[in-house]
Amino acid sequence: VPPKGVSM
């Protein structure tokens, strides 16, 4: 799960 604010 990517960090909040990162679109992946």
Swiss-Prot record:
Entry keyword annotation includes Membrane: no
GO cellular component labels: extracellular region
Entry keywords, A to Z: Amphibian defense peptide, Bradykinin receptor impairing toxin, G-protein coupled receptor impairing toxin, Secreted, Toxin, Vasoactive, Vasodilator
Subcellular locations according to the entry: Secreted
Lineage: superkingdom: Eukaryota
GO molecular function terms listed in the Swiss-Prot or TrEMBL record: toxin activity
Tissue specificity of this protein: Expressed by the skin glands.
Any GO BP annotation: defense response
Job of this protein: Vasodilator. May target bradykinin receptors (BDKRB).
Similarity-based family: Belongs to the bradykinin-related peptide family.
Protein name stated in the entry: Bradykinin-related peptide Pnor-7
Lineage of origin: Eukaryota, Metazoa, Chordata, Craniata, Vertebrata
